[in-house]
């Protein structure tokens, strides 16, 4: 079963999220992870996603009005090609059903 969990420093897989963030994006594309954790003044959603109990990846959304931008989306390298990214995008659509979604 695919599930999502809001990312916090106390999340069991916090270290995995942080490591994936650092490995999936080059330094010039990253912003300090503390900004993601703080949620951009209530406009951000930092979400880890799982297949059952297995950590698959994370996404970070920034929403203003009816516009949601996917700033970061990463899947664990060993799980790529198994539909986790597709399910993450479906989860985003479920979280923001009335919003236009942008993936840069």
Where do the model's predicted regions map?
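Short amphipathic alpha-helix that is part of the acyltransferase structural core
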Residues: 1-31
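Active-site rim helix/loop that mediates acceptor-substrate recognition in acyltransferases
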Residues: 22-51
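Secondary-structure boundary elements
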Residues: 27, 94-95
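Short coil/turn segments at beta-strand junctions that form active-site/ligand-binding loops
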Residues: 45, 66, 99
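Conserved beta-strand in the GNAT
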Residues: 48, 53-63, 67-74
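Conserved acetyl-CoA-binding loop-helix of GNAT-fold acetyltransferases
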Residues: 75, 81-94
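Conserved GNAT acetyl-CoA-binding A-motif
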Residues: 95-104
């Amino acid at each position: 079963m695919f599930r999502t969990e809001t990312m916090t420093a106390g999340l069991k897989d916090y270290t995995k999220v942080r490591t994936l963030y650092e490995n999936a994006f080059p330094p010039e594309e990253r912003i300090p992870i503390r900004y993601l954790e703080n949620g951009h003044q209530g406009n951000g959603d930092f979400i880890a996603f799982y297949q059952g109990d297995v950590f698959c990846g994370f996404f970070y959304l920034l929403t203003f009005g009816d516009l949601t931008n996917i700033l970061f989306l990463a899947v664990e390298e060993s799980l790529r090609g198994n539909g986790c990214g597709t399910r993450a995008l479906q989860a985003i659509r479920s979280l923001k059903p009335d919003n236009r979604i942008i993936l840069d």
